[in-house]
Amino acid sequence: MAKIGQKMGKKKLYDGVRLFGFGQKTGIDVPGEDSGIVRSLRKWDGYSVTRVPFGHEITATVIQLARAYCILANGGSLITPYIVQAVFDENGEIKKFPHPSSLASHIIKPEVANWIVREALVDVVKEGTGKSAALEKWQVFGKTGTADIADKESGYGSTNYVSSFAGGAPAEHPKVVVVVSVRKPKKSLGKGYTGGRVAAPVVKEILQKTLTYLEQN
């Protein structure tokens, strides 16, 4: 990751992070959304290109991460997430909720997005740290995350973590994207603390039940 960041350089890496919506609100239809933190380019130093790809120097919300994966799953098209699908009037009839419009333009080329989903992220589940998210019937794609929690006084430590897994299925034609993030997982439960052991199995269960439901309805 650090080598990729160095190869891209500060400007391209910064533009890519912003292009996927990090450091800005997604526009989801709920109050109090946080924009996360992405420092302006002028505040990046020579080490930023190696730190940012690992998630250091920035903060992101779960909905931002989910949207980023939805962009990949939708072939590179920028989308605006929403909570409410429809509302009912006093007669019980459905009224469509005015969803925020998604941009038709691609922020990355479809072939690049498809390669990331169907090759790179599938390999994580098949052969890498995301094996615990694998399903028998559907091909899962995704990426594990095990982030150190920064302390105000001592900086990044090695005792507290945020363990996550972001992904979806089926890889060939994605229908569902799921992000599970667990802050300070309890090692005493015997599942360790990594995203592959803590969050990936939860994503597997959610995907299994959701895809089964969609198939039957």
Go through the PLM ranges and name each one.
Residues 1-184, 195, 216:
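Beta-lactam-recognizing serine transpeptidase/beta-lactamase-like catalytic domain environment
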Residues 158, 190-202:
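Short alpha-helix boundary/capping segments
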Residues 94-95, 197-217:
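Short, gly/Ser/Thr-rich active-site loops of penicillin-recognizing serine hydrolases
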